[in-house]
Amino acid sequence: MYLHLGQSVVVRTATIIGIFDIENTSMSKLTRHYLAQAEKNGRVINVSPELPKSFIVCEDHKKITVYISQISPATLKKRTGFVAGLANL
């Protein structure tokens, strides 16, 4: 299954490691360092120029990518639940 992260960006749900609230988690020095390193290494994709609300960490073929999205983590998690629910039909 796939998860729409905003604009025209979709990722396979099987590649998602975590969905995080950017406002709450960026208070941590470790998280800020992680995001800065990911940006420095070219592993960050900004989904939209709008104010970011979440970041999504994905691993595909042993490559980590961090997506910055304007969609709230709660909405993204609901979408993954909806997709998982469809699989049970």
Task: Report each predicted region and the residues it spans.
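Eukaryotic intrinsically disordered, low-complexity regulatory linkers and tails enriched in Ser/Thr/Pro
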Residues: 1-89
